[in-house]
């Protein structure tokens, strides 16, 4: 049932106000540990500290977590990861490189997965029929990751809605998931998809907690400090 049991890490985030182009430039030049996204790596470390050592732990993240340093630090903390990819990463293939998209195009579907997709504005509720592909890949560290591992061996699970499942005027559902878990068969791939879908429940839990539990969003402060 994937029922949430509690919080292993929780923090209130006060985002610094930075205007326009300065925000983009500043974010690009900051060391990873000074970036806002580093909070996800801290969450992994805090979770490891409060969960029994004999329990296998997995951080599930959305596209915001598609950061090489995050994947590296999560593994070092003793956690696995499952994240939705946002970058068309270059992957090592023999003595050359190919993009993740190029590799997936060559891969034939290895099975199908169906689930009920709830409706929302601009999208009808339906049973989505997804084609499933999976494969091991090797991603290399960006130049900004000085001092870390040169490469990471991970698995990619790709799910894309079949054309005959998509209503007219709507885009197909498509996820590219990267994980440190071994994925060598359809059962393992579907397990990763199920874990990723748990994000919907987790996000709803946080939304209710913020709005109905702690009413954080109703608090108006003169100063964020």
What are these regions (language model features)?
Residues 1-225:
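Single, function-defining residue in the core of a domain
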């Amino acid at each position: 049932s994937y029922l949430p049991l509690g919080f292993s890490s929780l923090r209130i985030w006060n985002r610094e106000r930075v205007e326009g182009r300065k925000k983009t430039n500043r974010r690009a030049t900051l060391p990873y540990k000074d970036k806002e996204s580093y909070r996800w790596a801290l969450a992994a470390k805090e979770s490891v500290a409060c969960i029994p050592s004999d329990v296998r732990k997995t951080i599930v993240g959305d596209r915001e977590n598609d950061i090489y340093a995050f994947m590296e630090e999560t593994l070092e903390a003793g956690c696995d990861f499952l994240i939705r990819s946002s970058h068309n990463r270059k992957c090592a293939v023999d003595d050359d490189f190919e993009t993740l998209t190029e590799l997936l195009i060559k891969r034939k579907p290895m099975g199908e997965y169906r689930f009920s997709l709830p409706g929302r504005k601009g999208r009808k509720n339906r049973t989505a029929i997804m084609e499933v592909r999976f494969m091991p890949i090797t991603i290399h560290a960006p130049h900004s990751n000085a001092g870390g591992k040169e490469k990471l061996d991970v698995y990619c699970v790709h799910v894309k809605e079949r054309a005959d499942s998509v209503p007219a005027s709507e885009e197909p559902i498509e996820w590219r998931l990267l994980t440190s878990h071994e994925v060598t068969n359809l059962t393992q791939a579907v397990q990763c998809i199920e874990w990723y879908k748990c994000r919907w429940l987790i996000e709803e839990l946080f939304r209710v907690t913020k709005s109905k539990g702690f009413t954080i969003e109703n608090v108006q402060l003169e100063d964020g400090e």
